[in-house]
Amino acid sequence: MKDANLTDREEPHMLNVPRTQRGGEIVEPMISTQWFVSIQPLAEAALKAVQDRHIVITPARFEKTYSNWLENIRDWCISRQLWWGHRIPVWYAPDGSIFCAHNEEEAYREAYEKLGEDITLTQDEDVLDTWFSSGLWPFSTLGWPEETDDLKYFYPTTMLETGYDILFFWVARMIMMGIEFTGQVPFKQVYLHGLVRDEQGRKMSKTLGNVIDPLKVMDEYGTDALRFTLLTGSTPGNDMNLSIDRVKANRNFANKIWNASRYVIGKINAIPYNESHNELSLADRWILARLDETCETCTRLIEQHQYGQAGTTAYEFIWGEYADWYIEISKLQLADSSTTETTLRILVDVLDKTLRLLHPFVPFITEEIWQQLKSTCQERFVPENGWPEALIIAPWPSGQASDAPNDVANFNHLTEIIRTIRNARSEHNIANTQKIGATIITSDHYDMISEQQHILVSLAKIESERIEIKSVDDRSMSTDVSLVVSTTQIYLDTNENIDAEAETARIENEIDALENQIERLEKLLDSPFADKAPKDVVEKERQRLTEYRASRDTLAKRLQELQQ
């Protein structure tokens, strides 16, 4: 340019130099000849399919992303210079003539018809873009273009599950191709999950050295543990950070399921059949009601594609309610011959349905346990519709909202009393083997707590001769450890002198914590939440607020006693 006197001036410019991720080599653009497809007509049909709700994308926010891509689509470069792929169906004659055909035989026939002589054709060395080939997948794998039985049965399918990062590259291409070549959308729903990142939220790559090998994780912690971690850690369309510590915790969950099941199966083998059938206890009615609620909740969440929440709901039920509470209480009920058969039946029924709930999340351990349960029960305990051949084909458990809300509320109150006493024992370093005395004052739950006194004595480690349950507070001033659960007052006799100052400080801290909760709930219930949230959810929050206020008032009364 200087020699031709075409240079006006020279100036230095700071430029971004693109480099490859792995090797760091400079990437330079180069103009080349490629094959393109005019994709606009196909994009319009694919866009209309989503707008007309023939295809529903979950989460719905990605419909805007989908529309933006298709409304601004450009011609599609479909040729790639790769070693592997579907060859571009184009052949060249020696004179440069181009023949696009279904196969080589057809290309030669067209060449002869046009050129009138036998020639040698050369096929284009390029291959189709991967997304072009994979866009044909929903129907090409079923025998298309032939009208096969598989194509008639499986196309269109119900739902596609994939990552949000290939919504345009793959999902949109499948929709465009499906409509163009079959006249039908390839699927009715698209569920988009997020990406799995490392514990720090970084994308996994060999360069960073943060790639987690799933095979190694499965070898060390189990396939079910990894599967459950991925499912419960995900929400629709959002990335998840994969923590190995979480996988370890879910391995412990698998062990919990195994141990709980081993307990039930062992009791079936150990306890002979007893024809007596007594009325259901409060614990029986509670666990059956909670099972129904859990089945209903899990079903609803799965239908809404909230798979992580569904798995967490099942997790909390089997660990926090079935294993931690009902199994512990069943040990007391199985010691009474009049309640053994009913208790065993409920243990089996709840375990059977819970395994069905968990099967999509932890299929291997649940199938193994269920087969053992089925074999052990034989004809003694048979589900309503019999034992299917395998858990994987067993009917999904149905459930409904509890028709025994009082039983659930009463049992929850009982367990909260036990939990509160256990926490107090821990705070005061009372050995697990040491029995203590307790005075429980309640007017609202007097009958229930009196009936369940044996459970309190056993699970809270209270000495049976030193427990009093009263409806009226007629105590004289004492320095016992004082606790509150809603409107129920609990006073523990630990056979030790209680530090009044320390007890005062503890109660003041509890009152402060309750005040914070009360303030939070008052703000929540005064906000639009109260009008927009479901009525049952709002009612639960109102009930919780009432209980917090009652606990605060009772603790304040106890604080006054200590300060006198």
Regions found by a protein language model. Name each.
Residues V127-L128, F154-D165:
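A short glycine/serine-rich beta->alpha loop
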Residues G143-L151:
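Cytochrome P450 heme-binding Cys-pocket and its upstream "meander" loop
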